[in-house]
Amino acid sequence: MTAHLPILIVIIPLFVAMAARLLVRLSVPFTRGFVLAAALAVLASGAVALAETLVRGEPWRYYVSGWPPPWGIELVIDPLAGGLIVLVAFFGLAALVYAGPYLQGRTPREQGSFYALFLLAKAGLLGMCATGDLFNLYVFLEISSLAAYALIAFGGRRSIVAALRYLIIGTAAACFYLLGVGYLYAMTGSLNMADLAVLLPPLMDSPVVILALVFIVAGLGIKMALFPLHGWLPDAYSYTPAPVLAFMAAVMTKVSAYALYRILYFVTEAAGPVSPTLQVLGWMAAAGILFGSIMAIAQRDLWRMLAYSSVAQVGYIVLGLAVGNVLALYGALLHVLSHALVKGGLFFIAGGVSWETGVRRVSDFVGIAKKMPLTMGAFVAAALSMIGLPPTLGFFSKWYLVLGCLEAGAWVFVAVLVVSSLLTAVYFFRVIENAYLKGLPQPGARAERPVPPGARRFRLELPASMLVPILVLGIGVVVLGLFNEQIISNVIQYALPWRLP
């Protein structure tokens, strides 16, 4: 069974997605338990696969049906892919746990559709992490994207427009990527990443190869919301249900960034014409960092504030990839983990506050810390990590990015990182000031939930299934910050291109 872990990581959510749509007709509680058990199994499988890869000291290559590439489909799990698989699986489980109260008012059919679509999106992302060829990366990208379009529409009437817009832009992105892959296949006759890494270097001066890379970078840039290709993100993030949004914000853009990193550093080895590509990406990332931070300050709705903040944070990751030295790559890969934990937690918090009080506007957060102290405590921890204050994980990821930029002599990028941190402090401290330093809680869209006669007066500020993921992530950004050196030395340093065969 262990020998087949790479394929099981992808197959389990696919089969459970189909089963959930049928089982929900018999019993909703059983279906939910079944889905959660499957999500836990995927997380455990991913952790075992990552550990096995680290112990082996080489990538774990799995040939589907025993056919080796280029005729068969190859799955490859190395420390980079394994770490991201664990991250996707963890957030998939956390979001499913969190979604319980959100789904209580839904019909069994709607709940079954939600579970099926969510698991399809998760399977697509896991497949993107594990695949060893460019075409199947496209297939898994489309599986996750199509499911995401439908999940966004679960948010209500306004979310349907956002989902349609994302569908149109996302389809264009997929076409760009597929066109680029087609050009590479026409030039090399292979889609396998390992084969392309050997076949492409002699062809790197070809205009066709250069055009192919431009299309691939453009397609993945749209998917990861890299400025100025981010137009779909603010509306999509503003109207998506919180469990889905936390999952999307935490891992969907990160997996696209992973795919970009894979192609630039492992397939093309960042040589020849790719170097100008990295320079362009660096300036796009720097512009996105400033643009996202400034636009976040201008927002009055917390969800849109966090959405524009994501544009800036994607810029941090791409900036590290563009600078490209060891320290910058440490910072970029560590920021993938940091931002996933922080932004996933922040959207869990935003959803919990909205679910309990109806509050979404920053100005309505006045005094809310008195009503929801644990939730807002986690918010403060996440905000400090976003700003980049020690000992949170966000401080260390930004620290490595700054060191990498200094080593490269990129002083402008250093200034961008510092200014962005100050801007981030402005829009997060505005929320913290309202929550802790001003007055009593303001009435939101709903009145406070009444306590039934005869019930205990004490109750948690949120249902346990919502509060536990929030607290785990809030504590996690601090604890993992304290262990950042171990994360780098035991996982991230083995994910650099020159450490992998």
Swiss-Prot record:
Source superkingdom: Bacteria
Compartments reported by the entry: Cell membrane
Species in which this protein is naturally found: Desulforudis audaxviator (strain MP104C)
Catalytic activity: a quinone + NADH + 5 H(+)(in) = a quinol + NAD(+) + 4 H(+)(out)
Protein EC: 7.1.1.-
GO molecular function: NADH dehydrogenase (ubiquinone) activity; NADH:ubiquinone reductase (non-electrogenic) activity; quinone binding
Family listed: Belongs to the complex I subunit 2 family.
Topological relation to the membrane, as annotated: Multi-pass membrane protein
Protein purpose: NDH-1 shuttles electrons from NADH, via FMN and iron-sulfur (Fe-S) centers, to quinones in the respiratory chain. The immediate electron acceptor for the enzyme in this species is believed to be a menaquinone. Couples the redox reaction to proton translocation (for every two electrons transferred, four hydrogen ions are translocated across the cytoplasmic membrane), and thus conserves the redox energy in a proton gradient.
Any one of the GO CC terms: plasma membrane
Transmembrane segments: 4-24, 34-54, 80-100, 112-132, 134-154, 167-187, 207-227, 241-261, 278-298, 314-334, 335-355, 376-396, 409-429, 463-483
GO BP of this protein: ATP synthesis coupled electron transport
Quaternary organization: NDH-1 is composed of 14 different subunits. Subunits NuoA, H, J, K, L, M, N constitute the membrane sector of the complex.
Record-given protein name: NADH-quinone oxidoreductase subunit N
NAD found in the keyword field: yes
Keyword Nuclease included in the entry's annotation: no
Keywords on record: Cell membrane, Membrane, NAD, Quinone, Translocase, Transmembrane, Transmembrane helix, Transport
Pfam families xref list: Proton_antipo_M
